[in-house]
C-alpha cells in the first residue's frame, strides 16, 4: 500500500479531469480496485486464498473491475474508467501502466501455470482491448482500442486491429 501516494499522483498527471488527491482517492474506482487488490494480493501470498478471492470479488462488485489476487502488479497502475476490466491470475504488469475500460488480460486455456500476459513498463492498453495468453508485451507499447493481441509485442511498438499486428516500432 506504500505506492498509494504515487498512484494518486499518477492519476493526477494522466487524467486532466482529476482535480486533486482527495477526489481521486474518494471517487476513482480504479484506485479503489487497486487498494483492494494490494490487500488481497498480500493475503494470497500468505496462502489465505479464500479470503483473498472473497475480497477481490467484493471489489469487483463495488468497482466493476476484476483483479485476481494472484496477479503481480507494479507501481503506478492507472485504470481509467475501469468498468469491465479483467486481470487474470498469472498476469504480470510492470510500472506506470495505463489500462482503459473493457480491457481483458486473460488466459487462453484451462491448464495450470503461466497462462496470462506479461506487460512491461509504461504500456498503454486501449479501451476494449483483449490481451490473451502467456505472451510478453514489451516496455513502452501502445495497444489500440478493441485490439486482440495473441502474440508477443516488441518494445516500443504500437498494435491495432482485431488481429493485432505491429505497425510501428521505435528504435
From Swiss-Prot:
It catalyses: L-serine + acetyl-CoA = O-acetyl-L-serine + CoA. Keywords: Acyltransferase, Amino-acid biosynthesis, Cysteine biosynthesis, Cytoplasm, Repeat, Transferase. One of its GO terms (biological process) is cysteine biosynthetic process from serine. Pathway: Amino-acid biosynthesis; L-cysteine biosynthesis; L-cysteine from L-serine: step 1/2. It is found in: Cytoplasm. It holds the Pfam family Hexapep. Its EC number is 2.3.1.30. PANTHER family: SERINE ACETYLTRANSFERASE. This is Serine acetyltransferase. It comes from Helicobacter pylori (strain ATCC 700392 / 26695). The gene is cysE.
Amino acid at each position: 500500500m506504500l505506492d498509494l501516494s504515487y498512484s494518486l499522483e499518477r492519476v493526477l498527471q494522466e487524467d486532466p479531469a482529476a482535480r486533486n488527491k482527495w477526489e481521486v482517492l474518494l471517487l476513482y474506482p480504479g484506485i479503489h480496485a487497486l487498494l483492494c487488490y494490494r490487500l488481497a494480493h498480500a493475503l494470497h501470498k500468505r496462502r489465505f486464498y479464500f479470503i483473498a478471492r472473497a475480497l477481490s470479488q467484493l471489489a469487483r462488485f463495488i468497482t466493476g473491475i476484476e483483479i485476481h489476487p494472484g496477479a503481480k502488479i507494479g507501481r503506478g497502475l492507472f485504470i481509467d474508467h475501469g468498468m469491465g476490466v479483467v486481470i487474470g491470475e498469472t498476469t504480470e504488469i510492470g510500472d506506470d501502466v495505463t489500462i482503459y475500460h473493457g480491457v481483458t488480460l486473460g488466459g487462453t486455456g484451462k491448464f495450470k501455470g503461466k497462462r496470462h500476459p506479461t506487460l512491461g513498463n509504461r504500456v498503454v492498453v486501449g479501451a476494449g482491448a483483449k490481451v490473451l495468453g502467456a505472451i510478453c508485451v514489451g516496455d513502452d507499447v501502445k495497444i489500440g482500442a478493441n485490439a486482440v493481441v495473441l502474440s508477443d509485442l516488441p518494445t516500443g511498438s504500437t498494435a491495432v486491429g482485431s488481429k493485432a499486428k505491429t505497425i510501428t516500432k521505435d528504435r
